[in-house]
């Protein structure tokens, strides 16, 4: 799989060179999910472990025609802050000089690309945790999940550098102390930080839950944006 991805990305980059478009093109290499590859006895993108959700994100923004200039100051930097795939679209729009819709939940990665934040630093207000959800109804018939109703077969995660909190709709939550257990081998059912992580996860869910009219409020007097 990795050899195939490497070959196809190489074909794309070669074509850009042949077209003379390399210095005018933003290249983003990322993925929609990771791969367990047998870790924790799992395959595919199952579960809540980092292997399934820790994905690559490589951005090259050369600053040529059609791309706002001065976007190479952060070249070669490895960002330790949390990014999410919802950041890709606002980043591309920002680099192209287009307006980013205000309802976008992601943020432009431009500060990391142009070097406006110091190596290892974060822009003001940048997220300090990552979140994800997983629906495992397709595996609800397994022995471990026998009797768990389909609408309860889902989980949500709040993960920062200190720990990971996993909330299940139909089972007890668990916590991983990533300082003492970085490989996530010891799920804890009780930890002093769990209540705070649960509250932070609820805050995120309430702020980002599906909205019929995103970022709009309909009142008798009209629409508030």
PLM features per residue range, with description:
Residues 1-4, 47-53, 66-90, 96-108, ...:
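A short beta-strand-to-alpha-helix junction
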Residues 16, 20, 96-100, 116-117, ...:
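A generic secondary-structure signal for well-formed alpha-helical elements
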Residues 181:
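Intrinsically disordered, low-complexity polar regions and short flexible loop motifs
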Residues 2-5, 9, 26-31, 57-59, ...:
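Beta-strand elements within well-structured catalytic alpha/beta cores of enzymes
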Residues 1, 188-225:
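Long, internal low-complexity/basic segments
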Residues 1-25, 204-205:
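A long, amphipathic alpha-helix that forms part
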Residues 33-39, 89, 94-174, 178, ...:
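C-terminal cap/loop subdomain of S1 sulfatases and analogous C-terminal strand-loop tails that border
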Residues 14-84:
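Histidine-centered active-site microenvironments of extracellular/periplasmic hydrolases
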């Amino acid at each position: 799989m990795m050899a195939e991805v490497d070959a196809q990305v190489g074909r794309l980059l070669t074509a850009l060179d042949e077209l003379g478009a390399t210095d005018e093109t933003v290249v983003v290499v990322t993925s929609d999910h990771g791969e367990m590859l047998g870790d924790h006895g799992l395959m595919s993108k199952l579960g809540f472990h980092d292997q399934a959700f820790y994905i690559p994100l490589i951005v090259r923004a050369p600053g040529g025609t059609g791309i706002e200039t001065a976007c190479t100051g952060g070249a070669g930097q490895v960002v330790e802050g949390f990014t999410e795939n919802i950041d890709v679209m606002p980043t591309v729009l920002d680099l192209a000089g287009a307006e980013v819709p205000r309802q976008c939940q992601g943020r432009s990665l431009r500060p990391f690309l142009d070097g406006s934040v110091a190596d290892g630093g974060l822009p003001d207000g940048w997220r300090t945790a990552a979140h994800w959800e997983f629906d495992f109804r397709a595996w609800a018939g397994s022995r471990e999940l026998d009797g768990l109703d389909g609408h309860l077969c889902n989980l949500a995660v709040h993960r920062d550098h200190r720990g990971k909190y996993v909330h299940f709709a139909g089972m007890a939550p668990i916590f991983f102390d990533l300082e003492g257990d970085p490989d996530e081998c010891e799920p804890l059912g009780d930890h002093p930080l769990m209540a705070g992580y649960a509250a932070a996860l609820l805050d995120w869910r309430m702020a980002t839950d599906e909205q019929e009219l995103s970022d709009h409020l309909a009142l008798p007097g009209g629409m508030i944006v």
